[in-house]
């Protein structure tokens, strides 16, 4: 671990042990917003292949794929990716080929990740693959597993998964309990590898990044450049500060966030935001994000439960909303929501759009205008409307979502930047060039912090902005 400390010191970082948190990453100098704090290639990674979509094992692209003729599990986009993956896939391929064809469909991305973990460990031990300071199995061994906190049901699932891995590998030296413990490590430490627009493409293990602890109001952000994990500062971070990222979706009440962290990561968050639990600001925030709207449609107040249990009282205009009215709306909403498809097929999109609009109307009557459920419905509608190329309506929804994002996320959160980017592209497409320039500038100002300025994604955004500016100038001149 001395090598690791030196590696981190060279990057003005250090690891300290904190009570309740364990290993934590600290700065040894000031970092400015947008500065890269740490980057790491995955120790192992696999794409999220499904029955409807496959990805290249090397680059995660989806175009022009060919299946490995031997194992029939892995896909490649060409010989370059196949060659780069061959040392690892050669042994994996043999192992998968031994498995009955019918059982290969049970090889999920997580199972493959575990198979690759042991194959890579063996290849590094045999010196077929190099061992480096940041790419070695000892970093995986140092990860926390939380095995003592796992319930019996989850332990049984890990045991079943470990049996399948053992059946695939057939390594005499591998212990089933160790495999189960590593599955627990995956649950707490593996990261979804996302594209520049934060869409999940695969999963990977980044042991250095896993040293970074969670906060619901983090000072850094994790993004991916292809499969490289890159951690950038979101704020000005002073020397000797702890680096934190968010492990979960932070839009939600303290109770919702705590529940999510406990279920997935098995810890109770004590960050600055969570320490406000039960205080007036936290109660207001929860009521806005997950509570009901005022009975007066023109009022923007939030509702709290009436002490006499008659309903909910608006904290702005003091109007009472009856329990019966809320219950009836919630029941109607539940009935309609149960009919809504999670991922409608292309031919069902129009019907799905109408159904989600009905859900939206009921949510507008029931929830606060900044509520998370309403925001999620509008996100779905935006995506579906863009899929069927109903651009004007898509733009309207985009404009409804942006203010909610600005309310629920920090100012430099990449999701706000990406939403402005979508808005700018839609405005430009619909001939609203001046508005498009404004939206694209806002997108660039946020995304340069999370994504840097030299990535292909940001170069494309920059080019679009320049083109839109030129078009706006031309239109302005044409008016004179």
From Swiss-Prot:
**Which reaction is recorded as catalysed by this protein?**
L-lysyl-[histone] + S-adenosyl-L-methionine = N(6)-methyl-L-lysyl-[histone] + S-adenosyl-L-homocysteine + H(+)
Q: Which Pfam families match?
A: SET, zf-MYND
Q: Which gene encodes it?
A: ASHR1
Positions binding Zn(2+) 2 in this chain are 68, 71, 89, 93
Domain SET, chain residue ranges per copy: 11-248
Q: Which family does it belong to?
A: Belongs to the class V-like SAM-binding methyltransferase superfamily. Histone-lysine methyltransferase family. SET2 subfamily.
Binding of Zn(2+) 1, residues: 56, 59, 77, 81
Residue spans making up a coiled coil are none
Q: Which organism is it from?
A: Arabidopsis thaliana
What PANTHER family does the record tag this protein with? EG:BACR7C10.4 PROTEIN, HISTONE-LYSINE N-METHYLTRANSFERASE SMYD
Q: What is this protein called?
A: Histone-lysine N-methyltransferase ASHR1
GO MF entry, a single one = zinc ion binding
For the keyword S-adenosyl-L-methionine, the answer is yes
């Amino acid at each position: 671990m001395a090598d690791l400390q030196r590696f981190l010191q060279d990057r003005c970082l250090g690891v300290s042990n904190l009570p309740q948190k364990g290993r934590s990453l600290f700065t040894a100098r000031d970092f400015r917003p947008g500065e890269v704090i740490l980057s790491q290639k995955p120790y192992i990674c696999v794409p999220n292949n499904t029955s409807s979509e496959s990805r290249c094992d090397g680059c995660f692209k989806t175009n022009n794929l060919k299946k490995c003729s031997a194992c029939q599990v892995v896909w490649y986009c060409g010989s370059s990716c196949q060659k780069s993956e061959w040392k690892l896939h050669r042994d994996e391929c043999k192992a998968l080929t031994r498995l009955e064809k019918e059982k290969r469909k049970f090889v999920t991305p997580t199972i493959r990740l575990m198979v690759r973990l042991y194959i890579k460990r063996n290849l590094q031990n045999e010196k077929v693959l190099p061992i480096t300071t940041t790419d070695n199995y000892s970093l995986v061994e140092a990860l926390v597993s939380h095995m003592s906190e796992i319930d019996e049901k989850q332990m049984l699932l890990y045991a079943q998964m470990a049996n399948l891995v053992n059946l695939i590998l057939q390594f005499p030296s591998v212990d089933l309990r160790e495999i189960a413990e590593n599955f627990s490590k995956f649950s707490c430490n593996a990261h979804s590898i996302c594209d520049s627009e934060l869409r999940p493409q695969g999963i990977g293990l980044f042991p250095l990044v896993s040293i970074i602890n969670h906060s619901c109001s983090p000072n850094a952000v994790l993004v991916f450049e292809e499969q490289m994990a890159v951690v950038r500062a979101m704020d000005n971070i002073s020397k000797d500060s702890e680096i934190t990222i968010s492990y979960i979706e932070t839009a939600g009440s303290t109770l919702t966030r705590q529940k999510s962290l406990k279920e997935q990561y098995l810890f109770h968050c004590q960050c600055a935001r969570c320490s406000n639990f039960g205080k007036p600001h936290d109660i207001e925030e929860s009521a806005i994000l997950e509570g009901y709207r005022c009975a007066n449609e023109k009022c923007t107040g939030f509702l709290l439960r009436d002490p006499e249990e008659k309903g909910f009282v608006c904290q702005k205009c003091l109007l009472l909303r009856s329990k019966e009215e809320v219950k009836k709306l919630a029941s109607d909403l539940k009935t309609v929501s149960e009919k809504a498809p999670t991922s409608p097929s292309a031919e069902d999109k129009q019907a799905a759009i109408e159904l989600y609009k009905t859900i939206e109307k009921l949510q507008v009557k029931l929830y606060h205008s900044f509520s998370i459920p309403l925001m999620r419905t509008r996100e779905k509608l935006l995506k579906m409307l863009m899929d069927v190329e109903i651009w004007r309506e898509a733009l309207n929804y985009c404009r409804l979502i942006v203010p909610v994002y600005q309310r629920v996320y920090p100012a430099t959160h990449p999701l706000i930047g990406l939403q402005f980017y979508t808005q700018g592209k839609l405005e430009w497409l619909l001939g609203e060039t001046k508005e498009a320039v404004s939206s694209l500038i806002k997108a660039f100002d946020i995304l340069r912090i999370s994504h840097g300025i030299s990535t292909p994604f940001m170069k494309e955004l920059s080019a679009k902005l320049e083109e839109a500016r030129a078009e706006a100038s031309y239109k302005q001149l044409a008016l004179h």
